[in-house]
Amino acid sequence: MVFKRLLGAFGVGGPSVDTVLAVSRVSPGGFLTGEVRVKGGDFEAEIEHISLGLVTRIETEHSEGEHTGLGEFFRTEVSGPFKLGIGEERTVPFRVPVPWETPLTEVQGQPLNGMAMGVRTELAIAKAVDKGDLDPFSVAALPSQEAVLVAFSQLGFHFKSADLETGHLYGVQQRLPFYQEIEFYPPAQHSGRINEVELTFVADAGRLDIILEADKRGGHGSGHDSFGRFQVTHEQALQMDWPAEITAWLDGLAGQHHGGSHGVSYGGHDDGHHGHHGHYGHHEQHGHRSGPGMGAVVAAGAAGVVGGFVAAEAIDEIGDFFEGEEEEE
């Protein structure tokens, strides 16, 4: 038994863990449900806790360029300490809240190229190597978000890519330390003066911020970015004529002939259709660009972020997941 415990300290013959999701698709603000199945190994083990973390990939910008790192942006414990006997099997059900600002990985059933999401299970074992499991899941758009994305498709925008950036958006109540950029190629009628348009959603239970950023072409390389912002409730977003709103914003860009970052802000008025014009600032710690697409506009793909970087062992595990490999315990 002493020899088995010694081997257990190196991860040999220890407990195993497998997480089974009840559903593999959620929306921001929803719940990820399922159960963690634990099985005892060749020796009795002291389990310290079982935790679940939502993980993805994010791009950060520094003096030497851009860096892609893996991390988790939400973590919760689903079980406290307990003893696990030799060969004993236990099942721990869970219901984990999905943050409202969780980035999207698909639209209308089509994957967003550049995005992926996973839930990592950690089985912390006293005096032994911790065990883990990693399971992918997808994040579908809220109806209010999908209404905007559908409008982009109707206007002839073509999805380019999506990614996550560290930092916060100026003037936006943002909880997570990153934001998603969904990048589009403009329709033909705007391609002569706009390189691309980026779309960012920042949601909470009652409100949706929609931030638009146009990378404008300029003579002799003097292009600049222009911004637009809509702040509405989820109900208002479903009632708005988004093709008309986006078109009006694009048409307004044509009258901007001077450099710098400019924009139009639309407040959440009672009818949800009108706003006010104003100056809009740039992203704080803004890095690389990206954007979203819809149905026919969306391509397939994988990848996405950070709240605190995880340990090296977890990074290797997550890296395998984002490369599409299956983890073997």
Predicted regions and their residues:
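A glycine-rich, hydrophobic loop/mini-helix early in the fold
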Residues: 67
